[in-house]
Amino acid sequence: MDKIIKSIAQSGAFRAYVLDSTETVALAQEKHNTLSSSTVALGRTLIANQILAANQKGDSKITVKVIGDSSFGHIISVADTKGHVKGYIQNTGVDIKKTATGEVLVGPFMGNGHFVTIIDYGTGNPYTSTTPLITGEIGEDFAYYLTESEQTPSAIGLNVLLDENDKVKVAGGFMVQVLPGASEEEIARYEKRLQEMPAISHLLASKNHVDALLEAICGDEPYKRLSEEPLSFQCDCSRERFEAALMTLPKADLQAMIDEDKGAEIVCQFCGTKYQFNESDLEAIINDKA
């Protein structure tokens, strides 16, 4: 089961979140049939949103949009504060690797664009923030958002490793934030440790990668685990929701679906689930509108 572990240094100088998101990203790949680069880009976005949602309280919903002008198109993710996330990428078929190393490429195919977050607190006044894409690698773009928009300097690591068949092998990430009151000496020590950390791809390849991430972040500094919470890919779409959407269409459009297509098929963008509405279903919707 995927999980996020929240911890804090006993000195109170920093906090760290580490995530295992392997099942989340694997299910997203399965549902959207993404190729290598698209899988990694979508996976990193989902992990970023899991971190962002874990930082919220109440029943907030958080939308992350990575909007580029190159091959990927838009990547959209929605998460809640209960550990659920869903998402999709416009172009599922990007599959580019470095010839020499086999490294999956992401940044060069994101292009210029923006990292957009929308936090809906359920009050009818969602908070929206937009920052430019810095590298297109998503982790750096997320860190820039946290620094610029939330005024919280953060170290971020996100990645998805694929097996020889380009299926998700492991996915996860971390966030480290210095807390108010940390001394200059403590800040310098944590910065040095982060700079000397192995690459996240190396840490994720470890047998117990969540523990490996925590150990690399904290080193010999004593820390306390605050919580361990489950994470999952879960879509909240339903037949009833799409039926309500059909109810908003003009009768003429619904009748055209009956006459020309003998029904309608609606596919959820977030999870790929298909909902069929036959002629009788559409006629009932038309009658309900009368």
UniProtKB/Swiss-Prot annotation:
Pfam family, one: HSP33
InterPro entries cross-referenced by the UniProt entry: Heat_shock_Hsp33, Heat_shock_Hsp33_C, Heat_shock_Hsp33_N
GO biological process, one term: protein refolding
GO molecular function: protein folding chaperone; unfolded protein binding
Maturation and modification: Under oxidizing conditions two disulfide bonds are formed involving the reactive cysteines. Under reducing conditions zinc is bound to the reactive cysteines and the protein is inactive.
Keywords recorded for this protein, A-Z: Chaperone, Cytoplasm, Disulfide bond, Redox-active center, Zinc
Chief subcellular location: cytoplasm
S-S bridge residues: C235-C237, C268-C271
A cellular component term, taken from the record's GO annotations: cytoplasm
Protein location: Cytoplasm
CDD domains for the chain: Hsp33
Family, similarity comment: Belongs to the HSP33 family.
PANTHER family per record: 33 KDA CHAPERONIN
Annotated function: Redox regulated molecular chaperone. Protects both thermally unfolding and oxidatively damaged proteins from irreversible aggregation. Plays an important role in the bacterial defense system toward oxidative stress.
Protein name: 33 kDa chaperonin
Origin species: Streptococcus pyogenes serotype M6 (strain ATCC BAA-946 / MGAS10394)
